């Protein structure tokens, strides 16, 4: 091998080596950005699901009541967009039809004005036939577009009517759950934007790897040509395997975990008690039924203290934080060659999300305190005298019942259990609402029972006569 042959190298080798090195750097940079974009997507998904679960737990059954309205709202928007597209198509078809008719009219007018000079030959006949065919096609297209526009208009009107009916029926639930669905829409937009960014990075990585494999194959081809010209080694039999990094199915792309379906994850947040719904209806206790009724009635309360809530948490601060989270979520990662400020960016995003959650928790706490104050005001008795009089009547009733039972009434196991264990508030309420128990008493014992009850009432009234007068005076005042 001479020195002249060593110096005569193909200049394409240097070009392919530069392409190979640049493709390697591009692959490394894009893979780092892709990994960070995936982690950002998962952070956003976790934070979005957590915020939506908190809001869903707070609103309760109002989300279920308002869901048909927002689904109908989406369908109405889609129908409106389709109707607008059909209107544009009909307008274009109408313009094409008018232009075709004008072309035929001008051709006929031009021929009639020069009929003494021109002859109606086959060329004129073919031109008029072609223009007439265009008019007929445009008229058919116009009729089809008009029918399609009418059909979509009817669908849009039906969707609007259904939307109005649902709004009139569930107005309170819709107004109360509006922040939840707006927050859900913001989360969906953020996650969709981040997912589009991930897909774009994946395509860029695939393109960079394709460039890398092309440069590597070119280098292999140049190497084979050089060895064939020199005749140093015989050509190995069989096809040559691809080099490192030139595989068609790259292990790097398959090693990355697939993105979860964020639509499904966000839909799960709408059902906070999905585990409890698996219980049978027959196993539902009265307390659970009462809690369900309270939850259904909770979405119909009147928000009279909206000014106090605005004093605790400003809505403008919440909106500013939401916009900041949205900007941080879709902000591209700056820098290259794997030198990104990942820690600073993640810390800023996490701090903003924590601050937003803190303000939302303050708002939720203020709402709960206001609701508790309203409930306590509704459950408060009219006057102190009425409460004391009711307590005194309960004491007299208990004494009369105990004495009468000791005197003549038979003691059943149910009555004996009630006397041994003090009644709970729920049982006490049931005893007040339930009818009196039926007792088998003979006609001979009725005068004795009447005399005993009259004596007990006289004693109790004599003992608490002064207290009754005072309480009565207070209640009247």
UniProtKB/Swiss-Prot annotation:
Keyword Phosphoprotein: yes
Keywords: Coiled coil, Phosphoprotein, SH3-binding
GO terms, biological process: anterior/posterior pattern specification; female germline ring canal formation; intracellular signal transduction; mesoderm development; muscle cell fate specification; muscle organ development; muscle organ morphogenesis
Annotated region described as Disordered, given as residue ranges: 224-258, 276-306
Record keyword Magnesium present: no
A cellular component annotation (GO) from this entry: cytoplasmic side of Golgi membrane
Listed GO MF terms: guanyl-nucleotide exchange factor activity; protein kinase inhibitor activity; protein tyrosine kinase inhibitor activity; SH3 domain binding
Highest taxon above the source species: Eukaryota
A Pfam family of this chain: SH3BP5
Comp. bias regions, Acidic residues: 291-305
PANTHER family in alphabetical order: SH3 DOMAIN-BINDING PROTEIN 5
Protein family (similarity comment): Belongs to the SH3BP5 family.
UniProt protein name: SH3 domain-binding protein 5 homolog
Organism: Drosophila melanogaster
